[in-house]
Amino acid sequence: MSQDDAEVASGVVLEELSSWSEEMCRRELPSVLPRLLSMYQCSESWIEHIRILKIIVEMFLPHMNHLTLEETLFSQVLPKSIKLFDGMICELTSEARELSSQNLEIQVTIRNILQAMVQVIGGFTGCVRHVCATQKSVFLGSIQSLPSFILHIIKSAFVHCKNSECVYSGRLHLVSDLLQVLFKEAYSLQKQLMGLLDTVCLDPSVDENNALIMVGVIHSLLDICSVISGMDQAFHANTWKFIIKQSLKHHSVIKSQLRHKEIISSLCEDILFSFHSCLQLAEQITQPAAQGNADYRLFQKTLKLCRFFANSLLHYTKECLPFLSDSCCTLHQLYLQIHSKFLSLCAAKTSKAQQEEIASTFLVLLDPLISQLLKSQPFVQAVLASKLALPCELQLPQVLLLVVAMDKLPSQPQDVQTLWSTEDMTRMSILKGIFYNFGQCSGELSLPTHLQGTKGKGQAEVPVTLYQHVCVHLCAFVASFHSSLFPRLDAALLNAVLSTNMSTSLLAMDVWCFLARYGTAKLGAHHVTLVAHLVKSCPGKCVQLTNLSILLKRLLFFMAAPHQVQFIQKFSPKEADNLHLWQYISLQAFDADLRKPVACELVRVCRAQCRKWLSSTRTLAELDSLNTALSVVLTVCNSAGEALDSRQLTAVTEVLGELWTFINVEQIISQPYVQQAFSLLLQLLAFFIQTVDLQLISQVVNVLTSVIKLEPPDHVSLAVLDFISSLGKLYISQTIRDKVLPSLSCILTSLIVNKNWLLEQHTLEAFTQFAEGTKHEEIVPQCLGSEEIKNKVVSFLEKTESVDEAEVATVDNVKQEKGTFWEPAAKVTVEEVKTSAFQPHTKRARRVLPFEEEYRSVFKAAARALETTEFLLKHSLAPAWLLPELEALQGRIEKLKRCVLTG
């Protein structure tokens, strides 16, 4: 029989079968079903396939034994059906290239294929509906091939619908009606299948194959989720709901076979996508929310979806935590990404009402998630990893995460507290992590970023800065810190104080001061002694020494009187070796009966040190001890000046006058030690200005004029300003007035026009103090020689901002600066400090070259000539011939460089 004859014969048979009654189908089932299945396997026609499938499902399936459906029907029909459906998809993709409104033949072909696909899906829907109707509790073994084959067809249909714009290009409108039907039928089939699978019960003692089938179903639905995520929100959510429900329902049986990492990753991706959509909608809501506002209703719908996903993640994490070790990094990143879009400099601009709604509906669920993960060592490892290179926008979220975790630790068992509070080669402790990441939030600290404060009894919630937020929570944590972990607390605080990041160091100092107040007096005294020894042993001048000295100064104010006496005895002011320490101590910290004797003793020892230097060879190397003595005297004057009698004040003033005679202008510019001595002398002279000899004042002003012209370092200029502002208290006699006043005007003018904004600010402050106090009003207008200077002074006095910058522009600038300065400052090692530039340059033997002195002499002369030219350019217009001459000089320098290189 030919193929055509066979098709005709089968058509006759199918036509005959379609007219059978229900009773006849039941009776003839054993003989007819094998024949139908044979026809189904042999047929090459889609139409015939669909007719046979429809007859089997509608007429014979109701009479089959539900316990043998797998063997008698599904295992024989489904593989061929899948092949048929995949073939239809391939042909659709191929034919779609030729689709056009003019090509009616292709239109008909494509529409017929789509209708055939819908009919295939309808046939499988009938299978699922029948199983659901006949079995209250489904045994998975009796339908084991049905779920996987159906899910394959559903996914293929959804993928085709999702890619339809690409497949059909600009001709989608010709088939869009059938694509909608295809999507709805696949949607309906999946709902029917999920209803069927919901009745499945897995017994741990049954065949392991059943568990694998359920695992395969969950993973297939996971793939479908990724396809439909942007197509239908409700359907997407329902699919996820089923995945989570079945995963937890059969958890005891399938927990070890599930791809937990993939489930968590997909769920986190959907959370982020929904949250991003929610924020975009929130940005569009400019008017107060109203029930009739379509944008607001869509925002609420998306926010509920975010909450649903977060709840799903919360439930899944709770049950499957032991299997989530390789998902902890994903969960960590989820928390950071969400908060980066809500709180950081990169956050979306939404109204306060929307922010509160998002926080109360969605963000609130992240807190119990962290509670669940708190005991997980892999999560701790992920959060506190030493090599965690986070981008700028995730630094603030990292700080907030660590603060949330820290707040929860006091209620946790000691082993959990220890887990978070210890560190090793691969991870930091939580305290170290907070301090480090806090230091990276320069942009948020400078704006500053505000966070929601905690509510007190009867008090409204007040926004607080990031600094306040972290500091308060750190102090609360310290108050509840387990005693066995105190050594780690001390180490973390000290490490942070020694940080080169100013914000980190100040935060650690504030926490340490809280500890000094909260802890025992004995603990406070121990810490003061510890820091004092560190200050004494710290070499050279470095930021770490500055930080330690500030901490020491603050801690002393919390020291009990008996311990203050012990401190004075341990670090006696009578010993010159202790002067290095006392220069950093404010005597205001001591009780009044201790302050005066300490002040007098320090001044006596310092005067002796100054006399010793005056009677020595006065080398640069010996300036170290002199500077220390001067620094101590300045500290005493500023913190306990009233404790000194007139005799001591006079003696100090005399020493200052003698020391001033050794000031050398050239060394001020080139030698750091001389710069420090010069600055200290100026500040001390400013303190004693009422008793300083007028001739000495004239000499000082004359030196200052020369120094300012050479553009000294900023710290020297600041000392100059201290001295200048003090002159406002002084009446300058006629004998030196003509020398002093014009010089003062020149100095102030030079510093006001300085391009350094900090120096300019201090100059304006010094000028204001001088102008308000001086009896020589005629000098004030002389200092305001140009319109630019007048405007700066007026703006300063009126407290007006020099630049009116929009909030958005300010945030953008801060983000840009944060990106530029994101790399943390390099740590200063002890060796670097020992050989720091603050020390005078060490002399060493050198090889004498022929004509070397001549080379040096000529080069110094050339350098001085260039400095003079630079000075002239800053105070006058350049002549026309200067630029060509400089270019010619540049050419000669290049020629000389080539001569040096070639020898």
Swiss-Prot record:
The gene is Firrm. Regulates PLK1 kinase activity at kinetochores and promotes faithful chromosome segregation in prometaphase by bridging kinase and phosphatase activities. Phosphorylation of FIRRM by PLK1 negatively regulates its interaction with the phosphatase, PPP1CC, thus creating a negative feedback loop for maintaining proper PLK1 kinase activity during mitosis. In complex with FIGL1 may regulate homologous recombination. This is FIGNL1-interacting regulator of recombination and mitosis. It is found in: Chromosome, Centromere, Kinetochore; Nucleus; Chromosome, Centromere; Midbody. Keywords: Acetylation, Centromere, Chromosome, Cytoplasm, Cytoskeleton, Kinetochore, Nucleus, Phosphoprotein. GO terms for molecular function: protein kinase binding. The modification N6-acetyllysine is found at residue 843. InterPro entries: DUF4487.
